[in-house]
Amino acid sequence: MVKKKVALLATAAVAALLVGTTAPVAQAALKPDFKAVVGDECLRIGKKAVGRGVNGTDLTCTKVTTGSFAGTLRWWYPEVKPFGSVEWVSSSNIGGGYGTTAIAIGDAMKKEGLLKDYTVTYRSNAPLGLGYFYDQKDRKDLLLITGFAMPGGLATNGSKLSITTAKAVAGVMREAEAFVVPTSSKYKTINDLLADIKANPKSVAIGGGNYGGVDHVTVATLAATVGVKATDLNYIPYSGGGSLVPDVIGGRVAVGISGTSEFASYVAAGKMRALAITSPKPLKVIKGKTLVQQGVDLTFGNWRGILAPADLSDADLLNTQKIMDILHSSPSWKDTLVAKSWIDEFRVGTSFQSWIKKENADIISVLTDFKLVK
């Protein structure tokens, strides 16, 4: 049952990984207005694409004045108001996946004229990050990066907070996980590691993100393939990949697990080796064989998205959702996805709101089955 639930959680990631890491291609032809999405080319200024925007709003054929599409006619939200500045909240230390995502989104927004400037506020875990976020009032300029790890991080810390209290903006991407070891490690394949975990699970120190997060669930699912329970593992939680890196390089943990983008530069520099990647196929961003290539039938990916304050007005929420819809269509964001080997898994508005409620419940269910939460 646990394996089935985990597989269901990862299904979207697997499908997207198969198609999501190739470079974007130029549009071959104009779409009719009833098939248009924001950013598509159009012909007549002022023409409407009825119901084709966020939450069933209209798109308008507009001559764009900012960003990569400046000077061209595009299906657009002419009423959208770009941000002045944004404070991103990251529930990880500097170098962690949430902060990395905030920086990537902020930089792409600036390139597209959707944002003038941004800052990132770091808190070391899910309760602290979400707690800080919820304590702020009347903030139109505040957004939080969430993801798979947050529901588990809240539950395993005994927090009463929930991501479903906030207003859902958009889900933006998924990222494959990487198992990494020091360059001098005795482990050459994932099966070498699994052999030691099976023989004596407590003897293998495994570093990853917070208890109950995607790293922990991925490790638990992998261990289950050799009959080891999640509660028997020697799992050491860190507040993001940034704080884990020195302990992997220094050999203070036998293996580390986090998103591929957090380890890629260190693998490329020869400071650590990627023992296995959780994508169905090898990735350009990091050198290493997949679990599937090594005979382990497991794929997984960590989604990340954006939440807005619970007291944000409906009008300001819709404007934020439209900004994210525009960003998703932009060359700057597509380049970011390719550069980081992130998977283009996008949901915005009410579709993300309904999805995240179900995802939150599914994650807690999986963690309960693994006996990581009660």
Say what each PLM segment does.
Residues 82-83, 108-114, 136-141, 154-239, ...:
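Hinge/capping helix and adjacent helix->loop/strand transition within the periplasmic-binding protein
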Residues 148-159, 220-227, 254-288, 332:
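A ligand-binding cleft/hinge motif common to bilobed small-molecule-binding domains
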Residues 262-330, 358-361, 366:
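C-terminal lobe and pocket-closing loops
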Residues 28-79:
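Tryptophan-rich substrate-binding surfaces of secreted polymer-degrading and adhesive proteins
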Residues 1-29:
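Secretory targeting and sorting signals
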Residues 93-95, 148, 182-187, 209-214, ...:
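Short coil/turn segments
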Residues 83, 314-374:
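An extracytoplasmic/periplasmic, membrane-proximal ligand-sensing/linker region
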Residues 77-165, 228-254, 344-347, 369-374:
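N-terminal (or domain-start) structured segment
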